Amino acid sequence: MGAPPPAPRSRLCGAWGPFPRVFAAGAVAADSPGFVEDREQRSGVSDPGSLESGWDRLRQLFAKDEQQRFSKEIDYIYRAAVSAGIIGWAYGGIPAFIYAKKRYIEQSQAEIYHNRFDAVQSAHRAATRGFIRYGWRWSWRTAVFVTIFNTVNTGLTVYRNKDAMSHFAIAGAVTGGLFRINLGVRGLVAGSIIGALLGAPMGSLLMALEKYSGETVQERRQKEWKALHEQRLEEWRSSLQVTELLPMEIESGLEKIQPEGDAQRIEELLSLPRNPSSPHQQSKH
């Protein structure tokens, strides 16, 4: 007799035909005790990984460390914003103070004061109002401008992991465009162009100063990140070693505890009272 004809294959089997098959023997071999044990040991310990991706570096930039502190780049952006606010306040407030005092004196020639001190005090109050008004106006604008510029520049540098003059140009274009966006599309385009033209030479100047100092900010950042990664990798390896030694310690502990427990159980059984004899056994006696 010839061999029976093969069973017809369904359309679903035909559709899954090109895909690789996994047989039960292969699955059993893959789930061998050594493989399962190694997989279970490593499941509770996560690999620290490396900061090779740009998004990983950006997340690390804005993340806090073990002491709940931000990175040095964020601290630099904050300090630069505060310094820019102080400089902007002085830049806008001091000329406004002088101008407001002079204008008040010119406009109050016909006024009558009780004494000279009253006149000087009135002029000083007018100058102080001008200092606060125009100083605050220049202060917050300068602080926001510097913050946006440094944030964009630092973000591009960290994401691409290198310094480039184009980062300063892009940061200047973004900052200038945002500050002129209230003037419409023309203001946005004009502000972006002016910002890029001003950012490029500023970037070249800062890069030249960094090279002259011997170590750039990016080189220092890479050293710090490399040291941090090595520290986390060492911690991960030590935790992995502890995880690998834990089953052995548990097994040795069970081997020590089991004989003692068995002996104690036997002693408890022997110390139990014997069962009373049945009436049938008593009649035989």
UniProtKB/Swiss-Prot annotation:
Protein name (record): Complex I assembly factor TIMMDC1, mitochondrial
Compartments it resides in: Mitochondrion membrane
Polar residues composition bias: residue spans: 274-285
Family, similarity comment: Belongs to the Tim17/Tim22/Tim23 family.
Annotated function: Chaperone protein involved in the assembly of the mitochondrial NADH:ubiquinone oxidoreductase complex (complex I). Participates in constructing the membrane arm of complex I.
Organism: Mus musculus
InterPro entries named among the record's database cross-references: TIMMDC1 (IPR055299)
Membrane-protein topology: Multi-pass membrane protein
TM ranges: 80-100, 137-159, 165-185, 188-208
GO cellular component, one term: mitochondrial membrane
Complexes and interactors: Associates with the intermediate 315 kDa subcomplex of incompletely assembled complex I. Interacts with TMEM70.
The keyword Phosphoprotein appears for this protein: yes
Biological process annotations from GO: mitochondrial respiratory chain complex I assembly
Residue ranges, annotated region (Disordered): 265-285
Main location: mitochondrion
Keywords: Chaperone, Membrane, Mitochondrion, Phosphoprotein, Transmembrane, Transmembrane helix
Entry-annotated residues carrying Phosphoserine: 277
Entry keyword Membrane: yes
